[in-house]
Amino acid sequence: MSVSALSPTRLPGSLSGLLQVAALLGLLLLLLKAAQLYLRRQWLLRALQQFPCPPFHWLLGHSREFQMNQELQQILKWVEKFPRACPHWIGGNKVRVQLYDPDYMKVILGRSDPKSRGSYTFVAPWIGYGLLLLNGQPWFQHRRMLTPAFHYDILKPYVGLMVDSVQIMLDKWEQLVSQDSSLEVFQDISLMTLDTIMKCAFSYQGSVQLDSRNSQSYIQAVGDLNNLVFARVRNIFHQSDTIYRLSPEGRLSHRACQLAHEHTDRVIQQRKAQLQQEGELEKVRRKRRLDFLDVLLFAKMENGSSLSDQDLRAEVDTFMFEGHDTTASGVSWIFYALATHPEHQHRCREEIQGLLGDGASITWEHLDQMPYTTMCIKEAMRLYPPVPAISRDLSSPVTFPDGRSLPKGFTVTLSIYGLHHNPNVWPNPEVFDPGRFTPGSARHSHAFLPFSGGARNCIGKQFAMNELKVAVALTLVRFELLPDPTRIPKPTARLVLKSNNGIHLRLRKLQ
């Protein structure tokens, strides 16, 4: 009697054979992947022969040098040794070429390379694909559509709203400060800049500074997302969306995104309800000034269609973040720079008091009559650029002015922090010297890039500069800014330049 091929006595042998085949296939796939990684590494090394860099680990790259919160200090060391460019190995097969030279910056910013798929992609769950993340024709369409929201006629009345927001913050400080105590200013400044963007861009009635319960959770979410995105870029195990979603950091990021979206969704829904009552565009225009959100809601794409709900929220999320967090960074570091350089602070105060007279307010007409204060603002942004770096993926080969070249497919990081601290570009770069920005002084067109440059420069740079001037002017006529020697800020690179230990200042009320 024959034994069936499916009988129990045959199963162990069959299973063993299947396991052997599976193991062999797994080993083969592993060898193929290893060969692929080896070949890619060799290609990267050949492509970077013209770009020397410090020694790096075969698997971890430069990760030991770029520990969390130590990146800026490392960049300063590299700029000294490699003043034009330096490859930064994130892992054994992942590298970004950091650029520190204005000629190199000019070449890249004059091209149309897309934003880097790596770090910028990690921001997408938060701010969506709005003006910051879009590339190519969609970016061009959105940029052209949003430009009217930053026209002179729209920006001019915003100054009064900026004044209101700054005065609320200063009134609060007047109640809080005592002669010997110090204040962590970044959180209050963040609330103030959020208040400003809510009033100017979204016509918010009231003040988020006075009723800050919802706004505090939004600001906390933005702070968390800044840290989480930055950490994810540098964690080779978190490059996978699936792995990241399952990690504690991924779950925290998801919750922070939800909080941020709840804030922006609430703003959009309130405006849509208001516009349903107000009617068509011309009726609205006759009643009140149009703001950023009006421009978005009434805008038409080239095919005649309105923005989708997804595109609308992406633009609101983008502008809400960029319009308050980068400006808060700028204001905070400017205050710190002035606090540590009292002679320049005193000269700014004299200029502002001479301009405003007995009136403590500031108007649109005053903004171009503060040359020395503007020089100090720019010098502070050179030392502490609000956005420390931006990245591009090369869509075609590039050759730099010194003859060195990179092939298509490389990611380049334009280190604005490195550029602004490059001794080949700025002599004695760590010295605070507003004279560098004396009107008419000569410098490279791409030596100073606090708002990026080229076609993709910051669309809201004039709005931001106006807000910086208003905040500095009104603060200096009410307070003397003094440093807290026990808590010196430690600049740290995130999406926006922050301090690892906050920005603590002593405020002395002026009589």
Swiss-Prot record:
The keyword Cytoplasm does not apply. It is a single-pass membrane protein. This is Cytochrome P450 4A5. Cytochromes P450 are a group of heme-thiolate monooxygenases. In liver microsomes, this enzyme is involved in an NADPH-dependent electron transport pathway. It oxidizes a variety of structurally unrelated compounds, including steroids, fatty acids, and xenobiotics. One of its GO terms (cellular component) is endoplasmic reticulum membrane. The chain crosses the membrane at residues 11-31. Residues 1-4 form a propeptide. The lineage of its organism: Eukaryota, Metazoa, Chordata, Craniata, Vertebrata. GO terms for biological process: arachidonate metabolic process; icosanoid biosynthetic process; kidney development; lauric acid metabolic process; linoleic acid metabolic process. Induction: P450 can be induced to high levels in liver and other tissues by various foreign compounds, including drugs, pesticides, and carcinogens. It comes from Oryctolagus cuniculus.
